[in-house]
Amino acid sequence: MSAARTLRVPGRHGYAAEFSPYLPGRLACAAAQHYGIAGCGTLLVLDQNESGLQIFRSFDWNDGLFDVTWSENNEHVLVTCSGDGSLQLWDTAKATGPLQVYKEHTQEVYSVDWSQTRGEQLVVSGSWDQTVKVWDPTVGNSLCTFRGHESVIYSTIWSPHIPGCFASASGDQTLRIWDVKTTGVRIVIPAHQTEILSCDWCKYNENLVVTGAVDCSLRGWDLRNVRQPVFELLGHTYAIRRVKFSPFHASVLASCSYDFTVRFWNFSKPDPLLETVEHHTEFTCGLDLSLQSPTQVADCSWDETIKIYDPVCLTVPG
């Protein structure tokens, strides 16, 4: 693996990282004081250069920030979510506070995602209040609220293929597929026998979703037949905090865990574990694969560091 570019952020514990879909080398990180248990949060916008990582903008919020998503129609705009139940809309072109705050959830908001299809510009949020909300960022209140989960919601992700369709993962051990047009659940999958902390859609197959759970396993689900997973990936030794499909390889994905590692997988291979990266000393919570560079990965951890690097398995063909 090439040497990681590292930025240490004293007193801030990383929860989420996401590359800009527009600007190569720009990365956003959502972080919290005191491991997110108390204190404030910070949105960090970073740029890469020859000397490493530099902070372009830093925005503070009065509660921990748990997730971040870039706008799909404005390179300067991001949305974060926080422990006080609110979402924040930020403009990196301005060094001021949020342009807008959306406050409807009654508990921590752990997940936020901007729609991937060009048909609409919507944001989905998932909360510990057991609800999912869909927002038009230009409107101050949510468009609709989705109920059905029986525990906290950890992950909400739009389909990159089907407009208005999103997945959610919950402490109730289910993966659920929803449609904004019906405001009801389409599919309920009892995907694990433990809490599910993350899910993601395959970029190359509209029917394939992956889940990562407290049972240390990753499972792939074909939405046309959900009786059993189409793959299971084992190797992590503690809960899987986040999972991301590759934008460049149909069967490659990455996962990060409370075992301090990031692992890379190819579920189509007999020996699917491609590489294990061990460069953090605390829970690794944030993870993203660059949309601009096929080899570049970013992660962040409770060890107060943000890293960008090129794992060997993505730089070697096959």
From Swiss-Prot:
Localization: Cytoplasm, Cytosol; Peroxisome matrix
Taxonomic superkingdom: Eukaryota
UniProt entry tagged with the keyword Cytoplasm: yes
Gene Ontology BP terms: endochondral ossification; ether lipid biosynthetic process; fatty acid beta-oxidation; neuron migration; protein import into peroxisome matrix; protein targeting to peroxisome
The entry's keywords: Cytoplasm, Peroxisome, Protein transport, Repeat, Transport, WD repeat
UniProt repeat feature WD, residue ranges: 60-91, 104-136, 148-179, 191-222, 235-266, 279-310
InterPro entries: G-protein_beta_WD-40_rep (IPR020472), PEX7 (IPR044536), WD40/YVTN_repeat-like_dom_sf (IPR015943), WD40_repeat_CS (IPR019775), WD40_repeat_dom_sf (IPR036322), WD40_rpt (IPR001680)
Gene Ontology CC entries for this record: cytosol; peroxisomal matrix
Recorded phenotype for the gene knockout or disruption: Mice were born alive, but display a variable degree of dwarfism and hypotonia with decreased motility, hampering their feeding. Perinatal lethality is frequent, although some mice survive beyond 18 months. In the intermediate zone of the developing cerebral cortex, increased neuronal density is observed. Increased neuronal density is caused by defects in neuronal migration. Mice also show defects in ossification of distal bone elements of the limbs as well as parts of the skull and vertebrae.
Gene Ontology molecular function: enzyme binding; peroxisome matrix targeting signal-2 binding; protein homodimerization activity
Keyword Repeat: yes
Subunit text: Interacts with PEX5; interaction only takes place when PEX7 is associated with cargo proteins. Interacts with VWA8.
Family according to the record: Belongs to the WD repeat peroxin-7 family.
Function summary: Receptor required for the peroxisomal import of proteins containing a C-terminal PTS2-type peroxisomal targeting signal. Specifically binds to cargo proteins containing a PTS2 peroxisomal targeting signal in the cytosol. Cargo protein-binding triggers interaction with PEX5 and formation of a ternary complex composed of PEX5 and PEX7 along with PTS2-containing cargo proteins, which is tranlocated into peroxisomes by passing through the PEX13-PEX14 docking complex.
UniProt name for this protein: Peroxisomal targeting signal 2 receptor
Organism: Mus musculus (Mouse)
Lineage, uppermost ranks: Eukaryota, Metazoa, Chordata, Craniata, Vertebrata
Gene: Pex7
